[in-house]
Amino acid sequence: MPQAVGVIQTLGFPSVLAAADAMLKGGRVTLVYYDLAERGNFVVAIRGPVSEVNLSMKMGLAAVNESVMGGEIVSHYIVPNPPENVLAVLPVEYTEKVARFRT
């Protein structure tokens, strides 16, 4: 099944938490990366089947837009069928740390 990577960058921690929560509850995806980007921006990345990542990203974006926490979406992107070079270089590979949560 073709895989995809979805990334959301937000301003503020509560917003990225809301996005991650909605994405994981909204589809069969795995959280593969989370970190502080810069100046109060946070980034979260998911992986899973293309259709599930598309659905989960919509849910995550909606959660940030609907939250009353004052956060905002800085950027977001979906990479359907990422090439091996992307997976080798960016920190979005399935790791041992997330293996038990993989759907």
From Swiss-Prot:
One of its GO terms (molecular function) is structural constituent of carboxysome shell. Keywords: Bacterial microcompartment, Carbon dioxide fixation, Carboxysome, Photosynthesis. It holds the Pfam family BMC. Residues 4-91 form the BMC domain. Belongs to the bacterial microcompartments protein family. CcmK subfamily. A probably minor shell protein component of the carboxysome, a polyhedral inclusion where RuBisCO (ribulose bisphosphate carboxylase, rbcL-rbcS) is sequestered. This subunit probably does not form homohexamers. This is Carboxysome shell protein CcmK3. It comes from Synechocystis sp. (strain ATCC 27184 / PCC 6803 / Kazusa).
